[in-house]
């Protein structure tokens, strides 16, 4: 049993390293910077994300925490774990903008926090600039919906949002209820 865990750890570390190396060039390209030499901005073929239909995360309704689905890419697990770390913190307008660490978060601060943990964002963004983050369209694992006044994300099928739309409470929380993206720019990270 110990040997199997060791093998899984090597695969996981290799996956994380591959994710880091592959996203380094596309990270700059997707956030308006320059792509690394030899990389192609927006090239969805350079992804370490698995092929096939992604599984959905589960919401523990007692704790409000998200449970990553089996086989989720390391970046998705990191995003979910980051969301769990600030889940239930108070809504604070402008929270999470000056720094990823804050006593409370607003919508774009909370979205920036999970994207940063996934290696998809280097500094916090307000909701307006999130409208041009990544590439257009819905992602397989992570999607960001943003307009000039609000931003939220869907990570492995769960909504990460500070608004009480469809369920009670404000502040960063996982929500099982869906929200139509009408009026929002829908964006994703290449391969996710």
Where are these regions (language model features)?
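Secreted/periplasmic proteins that engage bacterial cell-wall peptidoglycan
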Residues: 71-135
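Intrinsically disordered, low-complexity
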Residues: 2-91, 166-192
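...with weaker cross-activation on analogous glycine-rich loops/strands in unrelated enzymes
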Residues: 80, 112, 118-192
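Generic alpha-helix detector with strongest preference for long hydrophobic helices that associate
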Residues: 10, 60-64, 91-95, 126, ...
């Amino acid at each position: 049993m110990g040997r199997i865990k060791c093998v899984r750890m090597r695969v996981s570390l290799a996956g994380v390293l591959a994710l880091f190396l592959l996203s380094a060039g596309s990270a700059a390209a997707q956030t308006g910077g320059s792509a690394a030499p030899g990389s192609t901005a927006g090239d969805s073929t350079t992804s370490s994300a698995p092929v096939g239909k992604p599984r959905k995360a589960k919401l523990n309704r007692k704790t409000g925490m998200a449970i990553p689905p089996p086989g989720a890419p390391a970046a998705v697990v990191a995003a979910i774990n980051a969301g769990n770390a600030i889940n239930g913190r108070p809504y604070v307008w402008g929270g999470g903008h000056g720094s990823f660490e804050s006593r409370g978060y607003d919508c774009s601060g909370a979205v920036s926090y999970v994207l940063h943990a996934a290696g998809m964002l280097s500094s916090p963004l307000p909701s307006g600039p999130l409208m041009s983050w990544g590439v257009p369209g819905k992602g397989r694992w992570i999607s960001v919906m943003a307009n000039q006044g609000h931003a939220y994300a869907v990570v492995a099928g769960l909504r990460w949002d500070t608004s009480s739309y469809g369920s009670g409470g404000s502040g960063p929380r996982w929500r099982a209820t869906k929200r139509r993206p009408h009026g929002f720019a829908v964006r994703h990270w290449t391969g996710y």
